[in-house]
């Protein structure tokens, strides 16, 4: 009887372990796939603004992969390194890049591992953004032109986590801005998994944590709030209270108890990506029209829009309207940076 019970227990444990490993592998394959470069978009791509915003292409290593980046505004008086969100590319944040250059900053952007022009089979995991930003900071410190400039960080979502998490190891950073970021990869994994399958997700949490540690080692344990506290670097943490991707009262960096060197902006009614968009009536009206036109096109092709038709549609979008920024927020960020620099 005891042997039979032991076998049943071992079988249950085996099923649990194999299910945990399998589920973790499946989730990572789905969530952290390779992200291609954008070929058409409702927002500006570099080809749309190349003449007005010349840039220098650079390469640097992050682990086994070579990342591709671009330096804009070489005559700027301070360097902003931008870290993009998961599923996006550096080009997604071109409106912010152009705005910073117009204010007199030099900007280094790059495609993270497994993204766009950079190497990598996939984006690996939630800790990868900080690993790549480490590499970008090391590159800037060795670049003949960039090493002369004071360094500032700007990140959103995946990149928002990175912009704070790297501070403990990069005290040369003068200030950092984290938009819609999370505190730790593990907290966000649990929050998102619970949203999909409820409390049962915590049965598989150890496998996700183990997977991150196998991939990233000690880097998997980085806490953005702890890095802010230990570094003493001025940090501006911005989050929308209507963010459903990273909850402002959950895994978000802004939900943590932060040290006095951190300033926070919890913005009513703002979502995960609305922080990046213009807040004008013209933008709202125009994007409503674009979305309605695209929905009609989608229905006309039963959801299978040919690539050439899709490209033609986006070519007709007025990028001078869609390619703006939230001026008030960006001005607050500029003031924050300038205060930290002086």
Listing of model-derived features with the role each one plays in the protein:
Residues 8-61, 68-70, 291-317:
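An N-terminal hydrophobic leader/cap segment in hydrolases
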Residues 86-99, 112, 249:
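The serine-hydrolase catalytic nucleophile loop
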Residues 165-217:
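Hydrolase active-site cap/lid region
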Residues 233, 247-257:
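Short alpha-helix in the alpha/beta-hydrolase fold that links the catalytic acid
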Residues 97-119:
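Conserved alpha/beta-hydrolase
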Residues 280-342:
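Catalytic active-site module of serine/aspartate enzymes centered on a nucleophile-bearing elbow/loop
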Residues 230-232, 237-239, 243:
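Short beta-strand/loop motif that positions the catalytic acidic residue
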Residues 92, 123-144:
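Alpha/beta-hydrolase active-site loop
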């Amino acid at each position: 009887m005891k042997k039979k019970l032991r076998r049943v227990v071992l079988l249950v444990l085996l099923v649990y372990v194999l299910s945990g490993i399998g589920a973790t592998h499946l989730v990572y394959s789905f969530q952290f796939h390779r992200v291609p470069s954008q070929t058409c978009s409702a927002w500006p791509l570099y080809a749309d603004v190349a003449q007005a915003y010349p840039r220098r292409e650079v390469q640097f290593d992050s682990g086994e992969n070579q990342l591709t980046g671009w330096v804009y505004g070489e005559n700027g008086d301070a360097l902003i390194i931008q870290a993009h969100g998961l599923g996006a590319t550096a080009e997604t944040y071109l409106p912010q890049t152009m705005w910073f250059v117009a204010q007199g900053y030099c900007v280094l952007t790059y495609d993270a591992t497994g993204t766009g022009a950079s190497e990598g089979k996939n984006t690996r995991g939630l800790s990868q953004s900080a690993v790549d930003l480490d590499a970008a900071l090391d590159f800037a410190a060795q670049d003949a032109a960039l090493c002369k400039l004071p360094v500032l960080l700007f990140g959103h979502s995946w990149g928002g986590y990175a912009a704070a998490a790297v501070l403990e190891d990069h005290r040369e950073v003068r200030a950092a801005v984290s938009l819609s970021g999370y505190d730790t990869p593990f907290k966000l994994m649990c929050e998102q998994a619970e949203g999909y399958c409820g409390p049962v997700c915590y049965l598989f949490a150890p496998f996700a944590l183990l997977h991150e540690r196998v991939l990233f080692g000690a880097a998997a344990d980085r806490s953005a709030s702890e890095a802010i506290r230990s570094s003493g670097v001025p940090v501006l943490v911005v989050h929308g209270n209507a963010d459903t991707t990273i909850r402002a009262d959950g895994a978000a960096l802004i939900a943590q108890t932060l040290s006095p060197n951190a300033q926070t902006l919890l913005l009513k009614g703002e979502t995960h990506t609305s922080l990046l968009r213009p807040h004008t009536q013209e933008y709202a009206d125009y994007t409503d029209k674009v979305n309605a036109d695209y929905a009609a096109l989608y229905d006309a092709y039963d959801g299978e829009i040919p690539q050439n038709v899709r490209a033609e549609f986006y070519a007709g979008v007025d990028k001078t309207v869609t390619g703006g920024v939230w001026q008030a927020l960006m001005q607050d960020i500029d003031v924050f940076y300038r205060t930290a620099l002086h």
